[in-house]
């Protein structure tokens, strides 16, 4: 299964380094040197092997093997980056999920009233925050007091909203 792991937002310097906005989890594994990433550009799949990875100002800075010049990579700005998930050997703990399994789930309150769909996830340090969108956008902390049930197979999440969370 191929999952989107980020988007190339810009280049950095003249030696072919790119800035990637990640929309994925386990970036320390996904972007480590030697990992193969697929960049989709003009409906073409281009495979690249990660040469180096570092984090700078909240963005992931990557270089690819065989790319040593900004001119070789600049045309990929705005392109999405994918990775095969089938080969992952990441062991998930209880109540830990891949972002790609959570994004797209429908969120309901504990009365089974639909609230919206998870459209994004971001990390805050203490816990992840799920961005839920329907007619409004809500920020739902992924904590036990709020998220009561996650059914990945049926793409369904049940929450008990704290006071003011959905206002």
From Swiss-Prot:
Pfam families named in the record: PRC_RimM, RimM
Annotated Gene Ontology cellular component terms: cytoplasm; ribosome
Keywords: Chaperone, Cytoplasm, Ribosome biogenesis, rRNA processing
Coiled coil residues, start to end: none
Domain of life: Bacteria
PRC barrel domain location: 94-165
Subcellular location: Cytoplasm
Segments crossing the lipid bilayer: none
InterPro entries according to UniProt: PRC_barrel-like_sf, PRC_RimM, RimM, RimM_N, RimM_N_sf, Transl_B-barrel_sf
Entry's free-text remark on domains: The PRC barrel domain binds ribosomal protein uS19.
Subunit structure: Binds ribosomal protein uS19.
Family membership: Belongs to the RimM family.
Protein name: Ribosome maturation factor RimM
Source lineage: Bacteria, Bacillati, Bacillota, Bacilli, Bacillales
